[in-house]
Amino acid sequence: MSLKNKFKNFFSLDDEEYEYEYIETDREEIPEEHESKDRTAYQSKAAGKQNVVSLQSVQKSSKVVLSEPRVYAEAQEIADHIKNRRAVVVNLQRIQHDQAKRIVDFLSGTVYALGGDIQRIGADIFLCTPENVDVSGTISELIEEEHQRW
């Protein structure tokens, strides 16, 4: 082969040598009956998955914070605990009555805004709970009965 033919073959394509053959194959069609069974099975599996609850969405542990404020400024810290979805037991026995009333008013507004609840559970002791905590039962009736016995 001459040098001229080598260059010609190198830079140009010879149509006869590089012709591709296309073979068309018919795809096998799936019968509709089989396809509908697969869809039904998939849909039932998908429906079953809707009943599964993610464990990550469940809170690992609930916390209850005990607080004994000595000044009104500590009410903000208590409100922050409630905002962070923690229940708080507030003991107001070591603070003046007018300051205690202001704290209860502030915490009442906080739990109302957050959809929570505030309950008196003893003499100058309150339980503030966020919306994710349910409290059942009452102990204030028992306290009143004890005072009547003495």
Curated annotation (Swiss-Prot):
GO process annotations (BP): division septum assembly; FtsZ-dependent cytokinesis
Cellular-component GO terms for this entry: cytoplasm
Compartment(s) where it occurs, according to its Swiss-Prot or TrEMBL record: Cytoplasm
Domain of life, source organism: Bacteria
Keywords linked to the UniProt accession: Cell cycle, Cell division, Cytoplasm, Septation
Annotated stretches, region: Disordered: 26-45
Gene3D superfamilies: SepF-like protein
InterPro entries found in the cross-reference section: Cell_div_SepF (IPR023052), Cell_div_SepF/SepF-rel (IPR007561), SepF-like_sf (IPR038594)
tRNA-binding as UniProt keyword: no
Oligomeric and partner information: Homodimer. Interacts with FtsZ.
PANTHER family: CELL DIVISION PROTEIN SEPF
Role summary: Cell division protein that is part of the divisome complex and is recruited early to the Z-ring. Probably stimulates Z-ring formation, perhaps through the cross-linking of FtsZ protofilaments. Its function overlaps with FtsA.
Stated family: Belongs to the SepF family.
HAMAP family assigned to the protein according to its UniProt record, in alphabetical order: SepF (MF_01197)
Protein name per its UniProtKB record: Cell division protein SepF
Native source organism of the sequence: Bacillus licheniformis (strain ATCC 14580 / DSM 13 / JCM 2505 / CCUG 7422 / NBRC 12200 / NCIMB 9375 / NCTC 10341 / NRRL NRS-1264 / Gibson 46)
Designated gene of the protein: sepF
